[in-house]
Amino acid sequence: MEEKKKTPEREEEQALPVQELPTDIPAEVRQKLAEDLNEQATEDLKQDVREAEKEEANDEEVKANPEMLTKSRLLKLLVKKQYVKLREVTEEEQPADLAELLEELDENNRLVVFRLLKKDVATQAFAYMSDEARDDLVNAFSDVELVSAIEDMSLDDAADLLEDMPAGVVKRVLEKSSRQTRESLNKLLNYPESSAGSLMTPEYVRLRQGMTVSDAFAAIRRQGENAETVYTCYVVERNRLQGVVSARSLLLSDPSTPIVDIMDDNVVTVKVTDDQEYVAREMQRYDFTAMPVLDNEGMFVGIITIDDAIDVLTDESTEDMQKMAAILPDDDATTYFGTSVWTHAKQRIPWLLILMLSATFTGMVTTHYEEAFVSLPLLVSFMPMLMDTAGNCGNQISTLMVRGLALGEVEPSDFLKVLGKELRVSAIVGAVLGLVNGLRIYLMYTYLYAGQYDNVIGYAVVVSVSLFFSVILAKLVGGMLPLAAKKLGADPAIMATPFITTIVDACSLILYFQIAQAVFRGMM
């Protein structure tokens, strides 16, 4: 059997002796690690290594990158107790990549590796991990570890983490945290959920009006390590925001230039009570990487950075998509595979039950026109096409309206504008679909089913005219319902696909049979 080629780095790992646990790890954590890395655990790790190697054997990315840090390589370092080497290789990884790798490990191995990481590396990786993986770690942490993690995290991330913890745990952690951290976190935790205040961080670079560019650079060096961003600095006097200065402006200015000469005093701000989605849209609108936040008295209290804004937009988009697909949104849901089968079912069943019961109206319409089926059974074959086409047309415009309302491109006050535009659009779409469908029916039943059906032209006219008016109806219903929902304070996404399909189906059938009765009056 051909022996696997070893890279110089892998050979070095094989040659390294067993190493003691790093001395900078707190004694309590060292004790836990010693228990987790006993002989039995090492045997279990060896089995995990073998399974990981099987998984990676057919991974093209691993084959193309022999130096890549993989799950099996990480576990091998644990088995061989090469803790210093483990720290070195993890330190070279991007925090996001390391977080992804840690999530591939089972809960016990993830905890062991995380405890072995250097403090700054662990903190950075922790910020990129999924909520589920972070919760697993937090539940296993001692109070000492949890306080240490909170102290090292940015304040907004720490506040987000504490929000999901039991009140008793939060109280213990805050009591053991430094006074400055405790006061800052208490302020953030007191802001309403989903508000700008709950999203912001008070960690920013603060400048004064009397500074020069040279003084500003000195201030950045002092404050920058703990600041959320150094790309934008804030000129503040008596807790009131006077202006902003970009790093670009500072770099391109003479060191002796006064800050007031280069700062922008026309600053766009938001209030702590503003909705987080509104803040994210404003940042998107102005192309900001950070947004200043003021309290109700106009005092400058913090900033919201672009990474948090992106998270908000992603969450809101996901929630809208779930509602439009008749799925109940779940704040605790993670990824598709990270969500349990029961949770998936629980999210989908309620709306599906409502829609199934609402289909009773469609059934009642069909039953009412039962005599038409007996007289002209061919009418039944066109019903699926008619309802599907009308439903698709309604879904098209409702999706555009929900998006437009979310982005602020459309307002409920634009009701008449939307109505006029959709009347014209639907007339064109309905005419094209009606003509093509009429031609299809005529050719199909004249030649393919020649002699089997009478009055083919009559059927073509009934279906095409019904389709024309159904498309117009669907476009109007799909466009108007989200606007009406927004006006009434309801969520427009709820009025999208689920309700529109049901309404349009029933109305399309009524139109269809009424037109059929008019054309085939003597036959029904």
Give the role of each language-model region.
Residues 320-321, 387-403, 502-509:
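Short helical (or helix-break) motifs at transmembrane helix termini and adjacent helical loops
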Residues 338-347, 411-426, 457, 461, ...:
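Membrane-interface segments at loop-to-transmembrane junctions
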